[in-house]
């Protein structure tokens, strides 16, 4: 009867989303039997697909668009497991598993646009709050980095760690004072 050992491999979200290799060489107590792997073409797993050739060479392709995969942070992992079978061609078979470790990476948080308006001579200070930030990494909590009086082209912005801000228009600038009605 044939025998075959278990195997392991890994992929990494966003960077190395496929892996290829060769499964352990099977053995058989019947020395005259030729043992081969039963092929699998695009076998679906929980997080990707597995393809296996009769010679034991395989490819795993991670579904990198999966929200669960994208939800992984640094040092977080998932596993996808596939069972493979070898045959001696005379009715004897043996099975084992390929365990794929999916490693997470740090995904960039994002925040949507925020709009506000100031008006020359009348509304020169604007207080507001930025849009709520999001992060695809499930366990990461994005925060704002406080900035004190960042000077822009026409005024200054103070951003607090809670996402609230104050924008102060430099109303004394010639460019600001030169604005016409509705500009």
Question: Where do the protein language model's features map onto the residues?
Answer:
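Extracellular ectodomain surface segments
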Residues: 2-45, 94, 110-151
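Extracellular interdomain linker/stem segments of modular secreted and single-pass surface proteins
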Residues: 1, 101-108
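Acidic, turn/loop-rich segments in luminal/extracellular domains of secretory-pathway
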Residues: 43-104, 149-183
């Amino acid at each position: 009867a044939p025998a075959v050992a278990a195997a392991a491999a890994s992929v990494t979200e966003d960077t190395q989303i496929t892996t290829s290799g060769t499964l352990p060489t099977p053995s058989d107590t019947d020395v005259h039997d030729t043992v081969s792997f039963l092929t699998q073409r695009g076998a679906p797993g929980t997080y990707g697909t597995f393809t296996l050739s009769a010679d034991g060479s395989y490819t795993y392709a991670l579904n990198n668009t999966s929200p669960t995969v994208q939800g992984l942070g640094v040092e977080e992992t998932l596993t996808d497991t596939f069972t493979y079978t070898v045959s001696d061609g005379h009715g004897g078979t043996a099975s084992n598993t390929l365990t794929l470790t999916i490693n997470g990476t740090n995904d960039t948080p994002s925040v949507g646009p925020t709009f506000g308006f100031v008006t020359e001579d009348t509304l020169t200070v604007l207080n507001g709050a930025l849009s709520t930030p999001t992060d695809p990494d499930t366990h990461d909590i994005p925060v704002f980095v406080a900035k004190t009086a960042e000077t822009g082209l026409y005024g200054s912005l103070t951003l607090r760690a809670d996402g609230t801000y104050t924008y102060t228009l430099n109303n004394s600038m010639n460019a600001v004072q030169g604005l016409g009605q509705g500009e």
